[in-house]
From Swiss-Prot:
The keyword Ubl conjugation applies. This is Zinc finger protein 1. Residues 7-83 form the KRAB domain. A zinc finger (C2H2-type) spans 182-204, 210-232, 238-260, 266-288, 294-316, 322-344, 350-372, 378-400. Its main location: nucleus. One of its GO terms (biological process) is regulation of DNA-templated transcription. Residues 169-402 are annotated as: Does not affect nuclear localization pattern. One of its GO terms (cellular component) is nucleus.
Length: 402
């Protein structure tokens, strides 16, 4: 980008004559000050700041440019006026005077040290007066016997926290008039709406007011309950546009879509199979290592996956929460109910590409394909005989055990 000419405060200043100024009503004068402060803030934000928080330029130059923004409540205009503005701003408010600073400009040492103790200090008090520049929000003044003059009033927001040097006071006043912050009394986090604060506080209190009417599991947020209930209803609103596969949660769809994008960065060192997520690789590697870290405390049966253990434990508890609305038969898993429903509807979504035969279950299609291909993946460790089905291998192994 080519070099741009430097912009001074004069370039963005609008001057009035004394007669013109006196014809402005209070709201117009406030607007004028807002615009001037905005321009001033924008110029400051692009300055080169030193490590100690000072601006690299002659402070007296700023004094000449900014002039005077004095606000004296219920008093006639002061005779002192800045050389650039051409008049003194007199507003019927409680703004701190910018002109009270000594000529040598303590401003840079005290007020605009944005990384100084001024920013970290929270020793401030809300001062009620005519409000925040006519917008109805009181400003925060530093709680000191002799408050610093200058821009201190723009340094704090409604949470007692310092605004950055890029935040002009005009933004603070207008935003504060629209958004009242709600502060968490546990962690000081702030929110735009009270409902968000109420919801957030449940993290600290542990409150879970939303209960599933099917399994009585409770949740702190209604959105989480809605997501959970999809397990019971079988609803899968998130569909892959590539293959049509549907998912209960959007996060699962995002993971699935990586398969289409061929982003599987996690590879198995044993067989070379790749996975989209690291936990999938970790689970897969247990096939090679034989590790089964999840054990049933009822029968001591072990499992590769925790989800398989949870499903298995329902056999012991007798829990069957998924009921068929057609015949009343209940099932441990929702997937079992979906398959069962096909007996009523006659749906057979899985088709053999070789012969066109259809099946209600994917597993049945796989078995059918093995018959056609002659594949026998289940091999006996004793004699080497292979089978197309695992159940037939189990029956065969009894011969060796006899």
């Amino acid at each position: 980008m080519g070099s741009q000419g430097s912009v001074s405060f004069t370039d963005v200043t609008v001057d009035f004559t004394q007669e013109e100024w006196e014809q402005l009503d209070p709201s117009q004068r406030i607007l004028y000050m807002d615009v001037m402060l905005e321009n001033y803030s924008n110029l400051l934000s692009v300055e080169v700041w030193k490590a100690d928080g000072q601006v690299e330029r002659d402070p007296r130059d700023l004094q000449r440019q900014v002039g005077s923004l004095t606000t004296i409540k219920n008093q006639p205009p002061t005779e002192e006026r800045g050389s650039r503005f051409g008049k003194t701003l007199t507003l019927n408010t409680d703004f701190v005077s910018l002109r009270q600073v000594p000529y040598k400009y303590d401003l840079y040492e005290k007020t605009l040290k944005y990384n100084s103790d001024l920013l970290s200090s929270r020793n401030c008090v809300r001062k009620k007066g005519d409000g925040c520049g006519g917008f109805g929000e009181p400003l925060l003044y530093l709680k000191q016997e002799k408050p610093h003059a200058g821009l201190e009033y723009s340094e704090y927001n409604g949470n007692g926290r310092a605004l950055s040097h890029k935040d002009a006071i005009f933004k603070h006043r207008k935003i504060k008039s629209l958004v009242q912050p709600f502060v968490c009394n546990y962690c000081d986090k702030t929110f735009s709406f009270k409902s968000l604060l109420v919801s957030h506080k449940r993290i600290h209190t542990g409150e879970k007011p939303y209960e599933c009417d099917v399994c009585q599991k409770t949740f702190s947020h209604k959105a989480n309950l809605i997501k959970h209930q999809r397990i019971h209803t079988g609803e899968k609103p998130f569909e892959c546009p590539e293959c049509g596969k549907a998912f209960t949660h959007q996060s699962n769809l995002i993971v699935h879509q990586r398969a289409h994008m061929e982003k599987k960065p996690y590879g198995c060192s044993e067989c070379g199979k790749t996975f989209a997520q690291k936990f999938e690789l970790t689970t897969h590697q247990r096939i090679h290592t034989g590790e089964r870290p999840y054990e049933c405390n009822e029968c001591a049966k072990t499992f590769f996956k925790k989800s398989n253990l949870i499903i298995h434990q329902k056999i012991h508890t007798g829990e069957k929460r998924y009921e068929c609305s057609e015949c009343g038969k209940s099932f441990i898993q929702n997937s079992q109910l979906i398959i069962h429903r096909r007996t009523h509807t006659g749906e057979k979504p899985y088709e053999c590409t070789e012969c066109g035969k259809t099946f209600s279950q994917r597993s049945t299609l796989r078995l059918h394909l093995r018959i056609r291909t002659g594949e026998k993946p289940y091999e006996c460790a004793e004699c080497g005989k292979a089978f197309s089905r695992k159940s037939r291998l189990s029956v065969h192994q009894r011969v060796h055990m006899a």
